[in-house]
């Protein structure tokens, strides 16, 4: 509808102008309205405008009324189409929300969340484990070496005690000389036991490695 194919009638109070004719009386019903909509809604795109004169003859209705009803029918169907589009969009949104909720439920159900207990139960890293093993080996080897050293000292002390008990009491001078010699021997034995303990420590370390 535009200014070339549309006529607007305005009703004003006053005398009728000369030559004015009252619009003809006509009958309009739902059947004619459905037929009108079928005709105007199935127009070919190549057709520029509606042939209102032909439609007026078919329906025996004035052109202005047909134009008004056609405009009203298009407006109603456009509004209905808009409602359908909004409804479809709402349904798609609701469906997507349901899908998201379903995925969230699956995630919470089948993928356990990380708890503090899990953090506490995390196994140590290989570097930490290796460091702990090395410290344990060093401690064990050191204890073993100290045990060897202590044993050698005890043997040496026991040997000195038994030798001194077997000697006569009247040979004190010789005992003094022997004690000095035994002290030197004890120092040598201690040095020897230390070297033996050192060798045992090295052998234990090599065995551990």
Curated annotation (Swiss-Prot):
Statement: the UniProt record of this protein carries the keyword Ligase: no
InterPro entries, sorted: ATG29, Atg29_N, ATG29_sf
Keyword set, alphabetical order: Autophagy, Phosphoprotein, Protein transport, Transport
Region (Disordered): 156-198
GO cellular component: phagophore assembly site
Gene Ontology biological process terms from the UniProt entry: autophagosome assembly; protein transport
Disulfide links within the chain: none
The organism's place on the tree of life at top rank: Eukaryota
Assembly behavior: Forms a stable complex with ATG17 and ATG31. Interacts directly with ATG31. The ATG17-ATG29-ATG31 complex interacts with the ATG1-ATG13 complex. Note=The interaction with the ATG1-ATG13 complex is induced by starvation.
Family per similarity comment: Belongs to the ATG29 family.
Function summary: Plays a role in autophagy. Functions at the preautophagosomal structure (PAS) in order to form normal autophagosomes under starvation conditions. Also plays a role in mitophagy and regulation of filamentous growth.
Name of the featured protein: Autophagy-related protein 29
Annotated organism of origin: Saccharomyces cerevisiae (strain YJM789) (Baker's yeast)
Upper taxonomic lineage: Eukaryota, Fungi, Dikarya, Ascomycota, Saccharomycotina
């Amino acid at each position: 509808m535009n200014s070339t194919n549309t006529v607007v009638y305005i009703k004003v109070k006053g005398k009728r102008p000369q030559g004015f004719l009252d619009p003809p009386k006509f009958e309009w019903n739902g059947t004619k309205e459905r037929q009108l909509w079928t005709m105007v809604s199935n127009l070919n795109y190549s057709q520029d405008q509606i042939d209102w004169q032909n439609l007026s003859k078919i329906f025996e209705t004035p052109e202005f009324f047909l134009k008004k009803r056609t405009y009203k029918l298009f407006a109603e169907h456009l509004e209905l189409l808009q409602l359908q589009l909004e409804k479809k969009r709402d349904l798609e949104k609701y469906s997507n929300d349901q899908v998201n909720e379903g995925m969230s439920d699956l995630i919470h159900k089948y993928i356990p969340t990380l708890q503090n207990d899990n953090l506490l139960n995390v196994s140590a890293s290989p570097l930490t484990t290796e460091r702990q093993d090395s410290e344990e080996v060093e401690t064990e080897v050191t204890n073993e070496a100290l045990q060897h050293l202590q044993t050698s000292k005890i043997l040496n002390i026991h040997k000195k005690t038994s030798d001194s008990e077997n000697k006569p009491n009247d040979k004190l001078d010789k005992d003094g000389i022997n004690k000095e010699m035994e002290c030197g021997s004890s120092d040598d034995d201690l040095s020897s036991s230390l070297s033996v303990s050192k060798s045992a420590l090295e052998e234990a370390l090599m065995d551990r490695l």
